[in-house]
Regions:
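Short, well-ordered beta-to-alpha junction loops that form the rim of enzyme active sites
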Residues: 11, 107-110, 150
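Short, active-site-adjacent cap segments at secondary-structure transitions
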Residues: 14, 48-49, 111-114, 153
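Short N-terminal binding/cap micro-motifs at the start of the first secondary-structure element
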Residues: 14-20
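Short, surface-exposed acidic-centric catalytic microdomains
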Residues: 24-74
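Internal, conserved structured core segments that host functional sites
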Residues: 103-118, 122
């Protein structure tokens, strides 16, 4: 891990910031990284969304499409929360750049953080290929983005 600095989803380090008010603690992250090797963020909270909040999914595209205003992040009540997701993505990018983060470890399947697979917008549990809004923005700016599972495969 030498020479790498990580931006990590706050929920993965035990912060109760998920939409349901819970965390997704991955103890191995805490065990394998020193506090001076990472900075944490929850893009959704940084974008102004509360804890807890209604579940949200990207409809008609993926995170890149949301950044291009060609798709929307809609919560389960039908509210368009795209602006908060975009604001949070830019907050994550700003934090990553300020700390010169080279890598991001972000929560799988999240409409903000996921890389590779996201929920399809139907709120039925179906997944499609695509990145979350924050993951897409970080990738656009040259960061290496991985899920917690990909990080664990790398270290175990």
């Amino acid at each position: 891990m030498a020479g790498k600095f990580y931006l990590i989803s706050a929920c993965l380090l035990g912060h109760k910031v998920r939409y349901d008010g819970r965390d997704c603690l991955v103890k191995e992250l805490v065990d394998h990284l020193l506090p001076d090797q990472y900075v944490t963020i929850c893009p959704e909270v940084s974008g102004g969304l509360p804890i807890p909040r209604p579940a949200a999914e990207i409809q008609s595209g993926d995170g890149l499409d949301v950044l291009l205003y060609q798709a929307h992040v809609i919560d389960i009540n039908g509210t368009d929360v795209s602006d908060a997701f975009i604001k949070g993505a830019y907050a994550a990018l700003d934090l990553a750049q300020r700390f010169q983060a080279t890598h991001a470890i972000l929560k799988a399947h999240s409409p903000s953080c996921s890389s590779k697979l996201i929920y399809d917008g139907s709120f039925t549990g179906n997944k499609i290929q695509g990145d979350g809004v924050t993951a897409a923005l970080l990738k656009q700016h040259g960061m290496e983005v991985m899920t917690e599972d990909e990080f664990l495969q790398m270290i175990l």
